[in-house]
Amino acid sequence: MESQQLSNYPHISHGSACASVTSKEVHTNQDPLDVSASKIQEYDKASTKANSQQTTTPASSAVPENLHHASPQPASVPPPQNGPYPQQCMMTQNQANPSGWSFYGHPSMIPYTPYQMSPMYFPPGPQSQFPQYPSSVGTPLSTPSPESGNTFTDSSSADSDMTSTKKYVRPPPMLTSPNDFPNWVKTYIKFLQNSNLGGIIPTVNGKPVPPMLTSPNDFPNWVKTYIKFLQNSNLGGIIPTVNGKPVRQITDDELTFLYNTFQIFAPSQFLPTWVKDILSVDYTDIMKILSKSIEKMQSDTQEANDIVTLANLQYNGSTPADAFETKVTNIIDRLNNNGIHINNKVACQLIMRGLSGEYKFLRYTRHRHLNMTVAELFLDIHAIYEEQQGSRNSKPNYRRNPSDEKNDSRSYTNTTKPKVIARNPQKTNNSKSKTARAHNVSTSNNSPSTDNDSISKSTTEPIQLNNKHDLHLGQKLTESTVNHTNHSDDELPGHLLLDSGASRTLIRSAHHIHSASSNPDINVVDAQKRNIPINAIGDLQFHFQDNTKTSIKVLHTPNIAYDLLSLNELAAVDITACFTKNVLERSDGTVLAPIVKYGDFYWVSKKYLLPSNISVPTINNVHTSESTRKYPYPFIHRMLAHANAQTIRYSLKNNTITYFNESDVDWSSAIDYQCPDCLIGKSTKHRHIKGSRLKYQNSYEPFQYLHTDIFGPVHNLPKSAPSYFISFTDETTKFRWVYPLHDRREDSILDVFTTILAFIKNQFQASVLVIQMDRGSEYTNRTLHKFLEKNGITPCYTTTADSRAHGVAERLNRTLLDDCRTQLQCSGLPNHLWFSAIEFSTIVRNSLASPKSKKSARQHAGLAGLDISTLLPFGQPVIVNDHNPNSKIHPRGIPGYALHPSRNSYGYIIYLPSLKKTVDTTNYVILQGKESRLDQFNYDALTFDEDLNRLTASYHSFIASNEIQQSNDLNIESDHDFQSDIELHPEQLRNVLSKAVSPTDSTPPSTHTEDSKRVSKTNIRAPREVDPNISESNILPSKKRSSTPQISDIESTGSGGMHRLDVPLLAPMSQSNTHESSHASKSKDFRHSDSYSDNETNHTNVPISSTGGTNNKTVPQTSEQETEKRIIHRSPSIDTSSSESNSLHHVVPIKTSDTCPKENTEESIIADLPLPDLPPEPPTELSDSFKELPPINSHQTNSSLGGIGDSNAYTTINSKKRSLEDNETEIKVSRDTWNTKNMRSLEPPRSKKRIHLIAAVKAVKSIKPIRTTLRYDEAITYNKDIKEKEKYIQAYHKEVNQLLMMKTWDTDRYYDRKEIDPKRVINSMFIFNRKRDGTHKARFVARGDIQHPDTYDPGMQSNTVHHYALMTSLSLALDNNYYITQLDISSAYLYADIKEELYIRPPPHLGMNDKLIRLKKSLYGLKQSGANWYETIKSYLIKQCGMEEVRGWSCVFKNSQVTICLFVDDMILFSKDLNANKKIITTLKKQYDTKIINLGESDNEIQYDILGLEIKYQRGKYMKLGMENSLTEKIPKLNVPLNPKGRKLSAPGQPGLYIDQDELEIDEDEYKEKVHEMQKLIGLASYVGYKFRFDLLYYINTLAQHILFPSRQVLDMTYELIQFMWDTRDKQLIWHKNKPTEPDNKLVAISDASYGNQPYYKSQIGNIYLLNGKVIGGKSTKASLTCTSTTEAEIHAISESVPLLNNLSHLVQELNKKPITKGLLTDSKSTISIIISNNEEKFRNRFFGTKAMRLRDEVSGNHLHVCYIETKKNIADVMTKPLPIKTFKLLTNKWIH
């Protein structure tokens, strides 16, 4: 450590901030701090002289200016007005320094808190300001430890000794040489000891001082180290003990020491609030802080012990249950009182986990109870304990104690008829004659309980316990799957549990059951008298060791925890269990099988079971009468609007739901059943507060007190659909009403209120007295207020900011919306039917019983229960009868979806998507085999057709017998007339309806039946959203809807390009989103529409044969410029003649008349490019299934990482099934699933505005680089790494010496700060970093970021070599066998003089913060330093080295032999002759400190680190560019979870994902944190992408546009990109040397564009640049203008590439004198035709006409060859859209791998 040099002038006094100030003789009644500076005792002549010349307080004086703070004051004196801990400094008026503490090279003053200003720091009296320990006692460090005894004298003795040893504390001398540091530090330590600070010095035994407190959260740990520090300082006796009292009384000296050290190591800003509260009362009461801290430590210890005890509970009945209960409840109460809340669920889990023995089965009973409490659990424990105590001597025991087994080796067997044994002592009999009892209980397979038992030692063969595979019913039995399940952690896999309490054998697997048959008369109950459903009964056959076979009866049920083998049934076949020998044996002693003891149970292996050939359908399909078969719970759950199981059971028990009873439902899966639609639709943050309204109203009669609230608006809906709804809830009955609203106007609200009041008055003969509402304008307006006043109704408004009072209406709206989202998610119906889902939910909710009242709202209102047979699941597919068809041969059925029962008739409201209307009708048939969204999730075999038929049979019979068929059904919510639609499109509708019910559909033949009511299964799918502007009447649903309309390849041209049918196809009817064979005879559901209008497209018609007829249909064929266009974004096309269009079919690549001197120019350009090799594709024939296909209008505006604007996305029709890599990435969410769950691919544009959303952000300019440097305090002051700290200190001295050597500032004069204009004063700082080669570097820099504009010339620029120039030079070096030499110029900027008059503060080690020095050199960080250095080195290279700068490319210099690329202080030299490089180096060394990093003279592979690129170069062969080492170091520091699932990504993103642009709701602190995180992540990704990972630029650019919109989705996509970078960090950009026979250089730009796939229909454009077949750069960006067609987007992309292509051409010609050929490659033939066309009239009126004309002139004037490239070979495709894995790899694996 260096000394503190305060000044170079001797008259400035020196001293430490911690040194005491001693005065001369002072009277006892006088404050020593009032003594003037002239009376301070001088300690040498120099200081005497200095003091005589001063008129103010010396710089080192510790005398404060506010004298009242230094005088003794009682603890009651309030703290200063600026707060309890204002920073104050011990200084004179001219020495203000805002910088505060500065630890290495400290400034001349130190700020002081009220600690230091207190009387304890400067105690009054004649003694010195820093009390000294008497010589008899010594310093705290020199005395024995407190354990050896107390050696302190009393306070009077200490005072006298200190008074006698009074002396002035002399500061240490100045350090003048590094060699003197050992001697100097000894004097410095002596100085600290004399200043009563010896306790902070590490002792000889190495005991450290306490660390600095840096956070309030660290205070508990810090105070432990501080107490240890006091103990090491022989002050352990003053520390409070457990009872809060110290061993001895603290002296004044010790209190001073305690006070000083506490304030040094615990800065006030880092103290906890409770510590600050103590100090605010008495800022000297450190002892109270220590006492309180020790109390907290003891409390934390008790809490930890309680938590450990609770987590390790063990109970087996050996102790009384009361004692166990008391112990547990006391622990829980203590934890709750200490703020650690243990809820019932957690407590029950912890208790049950510790149960063993007879109590272990209670682990699973919780699955049969909802919300089990601790008290309920202990009731069960007490019941078992009492039963255990009562039957200990009388109960037959099959698992005896070892003492019992000595006397009797045989277990007791009962050969009599099995009888029921109940655990509950209150229920000993069972009324059912054929009742068996299972010893364990049914449980879920996913039980989270754990087992603490371990397998006991056994003489039997070892058993494999790690089989975790589940053998499901119906799975083929193999040897490897005998151990089929592991249902719980304490089960022994592959074994049967031997149970003496079970009267029947039960097994979960059907594969061991022989002769299975149903037996509905058997009723099995568990220990808690709950029914266990039985699927079948059969025989269990054994083949034992003695080759004997036997069988017993077995019951099949999946609802048990273990497979149970009844000892009673074994005894019936003469088999007993001997637990002494641990074997099964016959009565004659023949051993049959070993027994294994595992945990508390005994087991026998399943290997002795004979498997059967029975299949699962045989078990499940055993004939059972419909009268006895129970309804599956998932079916009832969906039928009743996805209500929870508890509510449904209450409703059935209380008959609020009629037609069947609670026993008719299979509740076995109700507890563990998770409905995916409920999880998605009902996801919520937290629950509303219940019971809060009770303080606002009294008790009312039914329908006298109503709650109301309005929800909405719902955006992007058709005009016919409501945007709001208003709900009403009766306080007493909880009856609900909902009414749709299209707006929130006063008259609309008034109409609803009039309706609801009239309904209640007429139907319930009640009068509404009070209506509770919020303070929305729709309720507080004068019109409604007068209406309520007129009707005598009191409006009850919620108070401001008291939303709790409106809990009833809020909870109802939340419940209805949860149900709505769930119903829409489950059914797949469009969003404009949302209110129908609300109505359906309201009907059901009014019929469900409340758990509190045990009645439903309908029962409270006096209404009958809801007949469930009148309900259909929401969205149930049906076929509606068309009562008025267009003709007699017209199909009579229309596909539809059931919504809810009609309010106005006995009919049902059904949605007809083909007609865009809903009808009220009874003329419908349920469509079998289709459970709407059940195919989306794995519902196993949940098909409810039979259940639905049984349920609705009585209702349909009622309709058939009692209702007269109406001639006209009631139409509601119709967008247009039903009959008129049929008349407009008769042929179209006929095709649709015939397809919808065609028996030749793709359903397997086995699904057809002879029942006339059953309709064949069809893949009908409700559309996710319907555009209100679509006029087609045949919008049929598909099973899965693709986010991107599929484009089929219609014809393969002779050139290899693809003509695409420019019409989106509906997704086919299959599980996967793929097309079947085009020649398949199965029909497909396509969309039909009218023919295209002439003003939209210029099509020729291709004849297509229709199915089953001789007439030819025509499919519109797109013209050439339409091949890249999507119908959803149609724009006026360019009219091209037929001859021009046809000519494009045969000329590939296309040549211009004036740019093709040779026939094979274009071929040679394409031949050298790293394009993918594609297998030849046969011509694709059109399918007979094609009809006239309509467009789909879409208004999608979501920002995309692929999807709807993807002009190059298509699907090959003749492919039977596309592979996984063609459709999706390895992310498990597919494109279809993502869009179904998160997006609305047919939604209109959103009107919401996002907060913090910017319209467009440039990828690089918006990114802040990651800070890799350290500040002075981080590198040295607070650096805990001693070795690293030493290296940084060495780097610091090296930098200072370099600055002095370079004469960076004027050392002859120091300026006073007041003399200099403040705007010319530049702040300075030291920054430290660790370079990639491991060296530590320090840099003294100026704060140019706050530099005044008047101090530099804004016109000067700091130039560095462009990355394209470096890549071009490297590429030419490889092709021409150049030597590459890398140089570094040390402190380059310091070689440049500075013209302006600027001043900086001196470095910290000088200690001259009040002085300034004038700069002479361009210090790093100044605005002008870069420009000054550039001019300096440029002048030297030109004049002394004979170089010249390449025009247009700054920092690129060349002469006849050498090329130099300059990047600040790094130089890269390229030359054919290595001696030429050496000559340049010799010249540079004459002027600059030049270091050779890599001479590059080896002929083997040479590794470089050039500007962040890790380059491997072997002259004449190859060059590889990567960043593996850098990424390996940097990415883990980003705190991104890497490889969370242990797998690697194969693509950086997923096709078809859209960034949701809804309003971002986030608090400000979290927003700033996430923006900062995005800046770090995208900053690193951008750095890597623009260096060499050009394949990632699209993703980087898209995410960079959302840096200021850090939603969860954006962050997840960014994490995925970083994950891909990590997985592919070893990838390199590969270059190979060009063929030596090539006569010229070839510079090519490949262009591509994705039309309208960015927000607001902006297009993404991308370009890749190649030199001699080597990729040297790429660019991906969003088009600045909104393009109106694909052609315009392609023209925009090409025009963006031309300027850079021309500049690169000039650079290549300057560096290499070979001729150059320039090429432009695109996959847009329409763009090429425009460029080569001479006809200007055809696009004169187009939006892009001027840009096209300019592009044509540039192509002609710059001799550019425009060539066509196949889309599948266009590697620029990766710049414009996310691609499937296979395509992404195909386009990139040749140039980066």
Curated annotation (Swiss-Prot):
Record's keyword annotation contains Ubl conjugation: no
Ranges where the record places region Integrase-type zinc finger-like: 621-678
Listed InterPro entries: Aspartic_peptidase_AS (IPR001969), DNA/RNA_pol_sf (IPR043502), Integrase_cat-core (IPR001584), Retrotran_Ty1/copia-like (IPR039537), RNaseH-like_sf (IPR012337), RNaseH_sf (IPR036397), RVT_2 (IPR013103), TYA (IPR015820)
Active site: D499 (for protease activity)
Site (Cleavage): H439, N440, N620, N621, A1255, A1256
Location of region: RNA-binding: 337-439
GO cellular component: cytoplasm; nucleus
Domain Integrase catalytic, residue spans: 698-873
Protein residues bound to Mg(2+) 1: D709, D774
Biased segments, Basic and acidic residues type: 1076-1091
PANTHER family hit by this protein: TRANSPOSASE, PUTATIVE-RELATED, TRANSPOSON TY4-P GAG-POL POLYPROTEIN
Subunit structure, as described in the record: The capsid protein forms a homotrimer, from which the VLPs are assembled. The protease is a homodimer, whose active site consists of two apposed aspartic acid residues.
Other notes: Retrotransposons are mobile genetic entities that are able to replicate via an RNA intermediate and a reverse transcription step. In contrast to retroviruses, retrotransposons are non-infectious, lack an envelope and remain intracellular. Ty1 retrotransposons belong to the copia elements (pseudoviridae).
Name of the featured protein: Transposon Ty1-H Gag-Pol polyprotein
Species of provenance: Saccharomyces cerevisiae (strain ATCC 204508 / S288c)
Name of the coding gene: TY1B-H
